[in-house]
Amino acid sequence: MKLVYLVLGAVALLLLGGPDSVLSSSSGNLHTFVGCAVREFTFMAKKPGCRGLRITTDACWGRCETWEKPILEPPYIEAYHRVCTYNETRQVTVKLPNCAPGVDPFYTYPMAVRCDCGACSTATTECETI
């Protein structure tokens, strides 16, 4: 019964404030948020022979459930690692300013449409291990 009230409360919050109110920029929500969401991101697009251009786009952001536990048989550990990764993207092309003659002024980058927690894929995500 308590789960029903929790779900109804979340739906009411979404209806009253929209999805941005749930994942707002207030530090409290961002520090406790577990999951993967599309969020605004700003970076400097650069290319040799052109001036840089500050771009604001959508990117994937979040924390996903991950755990490891020891087991008695090799490899002696069971691991479950998920990362916030791109599920769907759209390619966006912009024209960089003041490019030198002969330099292609166009710069293409991915914009996140949908993000999910999943296994890290080097095709869409920079996967690093320590």
From Swiss-Prot:
Domain of life: Eukaryota
Major location (coarse): secreted
GO MF terms, alphabetically ordered: hormone activity; protein heterodimerization activity; thyrotropin-releasing hormone receptor binding
Annotated disulfide bonds: 36-84, 50-99, 60-115, 64-117, 120-127
Tissues in which the protein is found: Expressed in the anterior lobe of pituitary.
Glycosylated residues (UniProt): 87
GO biological process, one term: adenylate cyclase-activating G protein-coupled receptor signaling pathway
Transmembrane segments: none
Keywords of this entry: Disulfide bond, Glycoprotein, Hormone, Secreted, Signal
Subcellular location(s) of the protein: Secreted
Signal peptide: 1-24
Cellular component terms (Gene Ontology): extracellular region
Reported modifications of this chain: N-glycosylated.
Any one Pfam family match given in the protein's UniProt record, by short name: Cys_knot
Record's miscellaneous remark: Overexpression of Gphb5 results in proptosis, elevated serum T4 levels and significantly reduced body weight.
Task of the protein: Functions as a heterodimeric glycoprotein hormone with GPHA2 able to bind and activate the thyroid-stimulating hormone receptor (TSHR), leading to increased cAMP production. Plays a central role in controlling thyroid cell metabolism.
Protein family: Belongs to the glycoprotein hormones subunit beta family.
PANTHER family with a match to the protein in the record: GLYCOPROTEIN HORMONE BETA CHAIN, GLYCOPROTEIN HORMONE BETA-5
Subunit structure: Heterodimer with GPHA2; this heterodimer interacts with thyroid-stimulating hormone receptor (TSHR), and hence stimulates cAMP production.
Protein name: Glycoprotein hormone beta-5
Lineage, uppermost ranks: Eukaryota, Metazoa, Chordata, Craniata, Vertebrata
